[in-house]
């Protein structure tokens, strides 16, 4: 028996071939059925998992009343007003910080100026000490020079006196020798005055010179003492004036030191105020962030947004 099966191209089959084709078709249909069953099972598992996950997510409670636009607008206005106040506080804190920076710069300059003035006064005091030493040296040198001149003059006078005394003593010795000779020869009628009458003019002249030299010596010594007595008070007055000025300079140094300490304290206060303003700005920013975050969560909860 022959069966003709039409496909895309005409094929002539026998009975055995037909049985083989039928068996193959049955196998393929069984496999297709198994595949469809597996797909249905997978879809069922996915749907069960999806339903299980939906059952685990908590459902939000639906609002019992509708959205009030007026309240929403009012809430927005309150939020804007609060944020405006907080931003104003932030701006004030920023301005205060800028003022603190300026004040710190001013106090830094004041501290530096006070320290420079203090150093200048110390230098002035050192110069005064040098001036005092110079004045003392000048007065000492002047006294030394004056004393040297006086001593030189007195030495010269002393030498002249020694020469005159030696001359006078020599003449007296000659008179004594002459008297001894006259006594030896037995001539006692000649007196000492008669013998000394020969050298009397020289003796009188030398004695007068001695008196003048002695007077000159005393005058030189008096002048030296007077000069020393005059220069010592002048030196003391100069030193006293320098010491007074030095005392004023030391007082100025102390005053500048106090000003420097005050400026340093003011600088520390300015830095503390700046730290306070920085912390205040951080607190305001954190408050703004917390307020906006809380308002956002409240709005999400009001609209049922997860």
From Swiss-Prot:
TM regions (residue ranges): 128-152
Segments of skewed composition (Basic and acidic residues): 30-43
Pfam name, any one: YopD
Membrane topology: Single-pass membrane protein
Keyword check for Secreted: yes
Ranges in a coiled coil: 31-44, 253-273
Subunit note: The core secretion machinery of the T3SS is composed of approximately 20 different proteins, including cytoplasmic components, a base, an export apparatus and a needle. This subunit is involved in the formation of a pore, called the translocon, in host membrane. Interacts with YopB/SctE. Together with YopB/SctE, forms a multimeric integral membrane complex. The C-terminal region interacts with LcrH.
Protein name, UniProt field: Type 3 secretion system translocon protein SctB
Organism this protein belongs to: Yersinia pseudotuberculosis serotype I (strain IP32953)
Gene field: sctB
